Amino acid sequence: ESLYKMLGGHVEALSFTAAASSHAVLGKPLKDLQLRKGLLVAAIVRDEHTIIPGGMTTIEDGDHVVVVTRATGLDDLTDILA
């Protein structure tokens, strides 16, 4: 996990690696996930390819997921859920 604070600490960009413990988000289209308010899945890196996700994009085991959020306290990929 990596954390970057931006805009005077009002916004954070975080990077997570999807694993089996993230089963609540794996394989489901982003449009079907109940994401936290004020959170954006900005990019997914899969097999060295960067994906700018859309609603039909899924998060798969081993993906590196970059999220941008106003929320704090996100420690695990499943914390992106509302």
Can you name each region flagged by the protein language model?
Residues 1-18:
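Long, charged amphipathic helices and adjacent flexible linkers at domain junctions
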Residues 15-82:
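Cytosolic Rossmann-like ligand/nucleotide-binding regulatory domains
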